[in-house]
Swiss-Prot record:
This is Large ribosomal subunit protein bL9. PANTHER family: 50S RIBOSOMAL PROTEIN L9 (PTHR21368). One of its GO terms (cellular component) is ribosome. Belongs to the bacterial ribosomal protein bL9 family. The keyword Ribonucleoprotein applies.
């Protein structure tokens, strides 16, 4: 049975792919769950159009991620003042991904989502310089140094 996938299916393909599957798998699993449609000329044209729009969106997303990467690299490092720091250098609280995003925005960087920020550990709990990686796109990531300093 020849089908066009309308959803990503593990070990089979992604949206818009034309696949050949056994009749029972298509009739009893893929079609009832709306994961595929029967291949026809009209459906194939629609799938090709969806694939083209997805490819242009992927190119646009990659270009946008590269622009953000250049803006972040231009910053070099970001200072993050923390109000509550002990004399030993440990923080009473912790620095989260949201704090890093706010510091980047305050330093003149782009507005980012805190979910793309990957801290070395779950939270930063000490004063000093810490490398932070940001996953902007599945193929693009950038590293930024965050200087956590005690505010006096």
């Amino acid at each position: 049975m020849k089908l066009i996938l309308t959803a990503d299916v593990d070990h089979l393909g992604s949206v818009g792919d034309t696949v050949e599957v056994k009749d029972g798998y298509g009739r009893n699993f893929l079609l009832p769950r709306g994961m595929a449609i029967v291949a026809s000329r009209g459906a194939q044209k629609q799938a090709d159009e969806i694939r083209r729009s997805r490819e242009t969106k992927a190119v646009r997303d990659r270009e946008h991620a590269n622009e953000i990467k250049t803006a972040i690299q231009a910053l070099g490092s970001v200072a993050l003042p923390v109000k509550t720091a002990a004399d030993s250098g440990k923080l009473f609280g912790s620095v989260t991904a949201g704090d890093v995003v706010a510091a980047i925005k305050k330093a003149g960087g782009p507005n980012l989502d805190k979910r793309i920020v990957r801290l070395p550990k779950a939270h930063i709990k000490a004063v000093g310089t810490h490398p932070v990686v940001m996953h902007l796109h599945p193929e693009i990531e950038v590293e930024l140094s965050v200087d956590v300093v005690a505010e006096s």
